[in-house]
Amino acid sequence: MRYSLCLSYDGAEFCGWQIQPSAPSVQAVLESTLSRLLNIPVQVTGAGRTDTLVNASGYVAHFDYPGELPFGQDDLCYKLNAMLPRSVAVHSVTPVPDDFHARFGARRREYTYFIHRKKDPFVRAYSWQCGYPVLDFDAMNNACRYLLGKHDFSCFEKTGTDVKTSVCTIYEAFWKPYTPSLQSIAPSVISSEAEKSPYWYFRVSADRFLRNMVRAIVGSLIEVGRGKQSPEWIEELVAHGTRGDAGESVPGHALFLTKVLY
């Protein structure tokens, strides 16, 4: 039988999702733990690779087991969480059809990138402190319009990546202010004017993503927010640009895979 896993992980302790020969990965930790629990070798297939330091709050994976599990799904979830490192949490174990595939069956993936514009020790582990004092988020959201639709996004793809196509379809992309959950105990006040909020996130969803794509998009939109480039520059990048023409990639620790839809 095939089972799906819904899980979260802190990317700081891993080289990413995919197994690497000489570095810890989320996939390796899950396979090792499941194999010990079920007393057979278990292979886990994930919704896609995430890079070093990148986190996930809504990751989906699947594994196969010959027959019924030796204990209930809730018990397996409990035992997994007891054995896994604190950086990985399994939220559910669910039986799925045999043709369910965590990677190839996914029709939409969502990423969220967090930034803050003032020093804050409570969010620094999962948010990038953007050092530019002024960012025009209206211009950045205007630029997001040029990302929507089906395009070749090789201008945001890590160079040297071996993929068959760089074409993706982006369904939504926007910036929005937010209030961190610890803000209620932090000794600071958020302005009632959204534009002055020090805390923002960028959300983007697509049918697929290229390696380093989201971080390169965020870095390019920051250039628009700084006033170094116009919103229309993003349109030109997508149409004719190369990776060298786009903005620098922002750090990976503030990026989350937040949702996978099937």
State the predicted function of each range.
Residues 1-262:
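Structured-RNA-binding interfaces characteristic of tRNA pseudouridine synthases
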